[in-house]
From Swiss-Prot:
Catalyzes the attachment of proline to tRNA(Pro) in a two-step reaction: proline is first activated by ATP to form Pro-AMP and then transferred to the acceptor end of tRNA(Pro). As ProRS can inadvertently accommodate and process non-cognate amino acids such as alanine and cysteine, to avoid such errors it has two additional distinct editing activities against alanine. One activity is designated as 'pretransfer' editing and involves the tRNA(Pro)-independent hydrolysis of activated Ala-AMP. The keyword ATP-binding applies. This is Proline--tRNA ligase. The gene is proS. GO terms for molecular function: aminoacyl-tRNA deacylase activity; ATP binding; proline-tRNA ligase activity.
Length: 571
């Protein structure tokens, strides 16, 4: 490809509304252009990269026997009402009404559509297992689209769905898809971690997320420094560092705390160690009209996913209002605690092991100090309620936990019979009786992968593509292309490289574009290999080669360039 025949749309300045590196560089490198908030046009340079990601995903899906299909992007509300997700999904679901007043949505995912397809096309266990996938545009009405392709309202996704006669068969396919996902991200040259995850609104049982490691990631991922244990922050089990509760050494006392509405104020005002304080968070209970208290240590954060999964707690989690607190307890949020609390409590595991600690007295501006379990109050229900923190013991007993930032690029789920039961998706089993199909679903954020790769591979000059993902493998830059010798040598090499199967971008912009600008553009775009053709080099029988990751160029004999490149470019 010649730049004279290509839309080379590089920009020198960084757009003011682009915060993360991938968004900045994709705009500057001419890969995408913003149409509206969360909506982007893929330009030729970016689309070449996107298609390469799609090709690798497609190859790995085909390799595990998945069948490619293409489902409608617009889905009827009736299917979502059958599954129960029409009301559950919330405002992120883009809804519309046609001229006949029928309700539809723009699909953020396709569980309902594929289940409808399966119940109409499958009738016997002999047709199972079956795994079908598509690569398609999805839609989500994000409240605050941000970070370019990281969190947009329209995105490209590969979603696959498998159907099985039983959970044992589902597990086999799930394991194969887990390996296929690892193959995809390994082939793309990404540093990634698969982690245990929560199923969220998709539903079902077990799941894993695949995260590209990057400081700009929105997710915290947790892993052990002594084993293969890894989970996202929502799923990671919090194990107390303490082995047992220390003996009581203080007397219980009621203390006036007029200026201590927060844990920080309590710690600062009374010289308490923060690990000797607790937070009492009152939420709506599963029983309508009731409240329940969740209690964690003062230096810990409530894990809302874990909390909402407690049998006695309403899901989704709803915090009690100040008015509800006053009505039920008679005190405000800054003065609550488990001692004499007229509500049921669930305490975190680490709270159970505390002694001589401080709690709100359920009286405004008062706290109890020197509180101890069993002496002053009974131990209530104990559960894992908090986020892990770095240094916690690994749940598998091997090593301690570390936390890094990650960008979620893939998620696989064992759905079980959640959708097949709701939508009556059955086949006749071996015994001739109807069987609800066990399902798996498997997603890769194809367009997000492109952005994640840039977050992981860039420098002050631009993107650093590997040979697998680069829009072009080689930038061929002639200096003074208008001269006969340079033009002849450049055109000959271009023909040889393209005939050998290399993807080459020949920068044939005229002399008004300086060599410095050409070099800077190719560095910005991130093309991994650069060859420069010049009068001076040709006079010496050489061309100049430079890798995107090397600081200094090297001279290569004209006769050796093709074999040299064949040895450098990974294909």
């Amino acid at each position: 490809m010649r730049t004279s025949q290509f839309l080379l749309a590089t920009q020198k300045e960084t757009p003011s509304d682009a915060v993360v590196v991938s968004h900045q560089l994709m705009l500057r490198a001419g890969m995408i252009r913003k149409l509206a908030s969360g909506l982007y046009t893929w330009l030729p340079m970016g689309l070449r990269v996107l298609r390469k990601v799609e090709a690798i995903v497609r190859e790995e899906m085909n390799a595990v026997g998945a069948l490619e299909i293409l489902m409608p992007g617009i889905q009827p509300a009736e299917l979502w009402q059958e599954s129960g997700r029409w009301e559950q999904y919330g405002p992120e679901l883009m809804r519309l009404v046609d001229r006949h007043n029928r309700e539809f949505c723009l699909g953020p995912t396709h569980e309902e559509v594929i289940t409808d397809l399966a119940r109409n096309e499958l009738n016997s266990y002999k047709q199972l297992p079956i795994n079908m996938y598509q690569i398609q545009t999805k839609f989500r009405d994000e409240i605050r689209p941000r970070f370019g392709l990281m969190r947009g309202r329209e995105f490209v996704m590969k979603d696959a769905y498998s159907f099985h006669a039983d959970n044992a068969s589902l597990q086999v396919t799930y394991d194969r898809m887990h390996l296929a996902y690892s193959n995809v991200f390994s082939r793309l040259g990404l540093k990634f971690r698969p982690v245990e995850a929560d199923n969220g609104s998709i539903g079902g049982a077990g799941s894993h997320e695949f995260h590209v490691l990057a400081e700009s990631g929105e997710d915290d991922i947790v892993f052990s420094n002594g084993s293969d244990y890894a989970a996202n922050i929502e799923k990671a089990e919090a194990v107390p560092r303490e082995k047992a509760r220390a003996a009581a050494t203080e007397e219980l006392r009621l203390v006036d705390t007029p200026n201590a509405k927060t844990i920080a104020q309590l710690v600062e005002g009374f010289g308490l160690p923060i690990e000797k304080t607790v937070k009492t968070l009152v939420v709506h209970a599963a029983e309508e009209g009731k409240l329940i208290a969740l209690i964690i240590r003062g230096d810990h954060e409530l894990n809302e996913i874990k909390a909402s999964q407690q049998e006695l707690v309403a899901s989704p989690l709803v915090m009690a209002s100040e008015a509800e607190l006053r009505d039920a307890i008679g005190a405000g949020a800054g003065s609550l605690g488990p001692l004499n609390l007229p509500l049921p409590c669930i305490i975190d595991r680490s709270v159970e092991l505390m002694s001589d600690f401080a709690v709100g007295a359920n009286i405004d501006d008062k706290h109890y100090f020197g509180v101890n379990w069993e002496r002053d109050l009974p131990v209530p229900t104990v559960a894992d309620l908090r986020n892990v923190v770095a240094g916690d013991p690994s749940p598998d007993g091997q090593g301690t936990l570390e936390i890094k930032r990650g960008i979620e690029v893939g998620h696989i789920f064992q759905l079980g019979t959640k959708y097949s039961e709701a939508m009556k998706c059955q086949v006749l089993g071996e015994n001739g009786k109807p069987v609800n199909l066990a399902m798996g679903c498997y997603g890769i954020g194809v367009s997000r992968v492109v952005a994640a790769a840039i977050e992981q591979n860039s420098d002050e000059n631009g993107i650093i593509w590997n040979d697998t993902l680069a829009p072009f493998q080689i930038a061929l830059i002639p200096l003074r292309y208008e001269t006969d010798a340079v033009r002849e040598a450049t055109d000959k090499l271009y023909a040889e490289l393209t005939a050998a199967g290399f993807e080459v971008l020949l920068d044939d912009r005229d002399k008004k574009t300086s060599p410095g600008i050409k070099f800077a553009d190719m560095e910005l775009i991130g093309i991994p290999h650069r060859i420069v053709v010049s009068d001076r080099g040709l006079a010496e029988g050489n061309l100049e080669y430079k890798s995107r990751t090397e600081s200094q160029p090297q001279a290569i004999a004209v006769a050796d360039v093709l074999s040299f490149i064949q040895g450098r470019v990974k294909r």
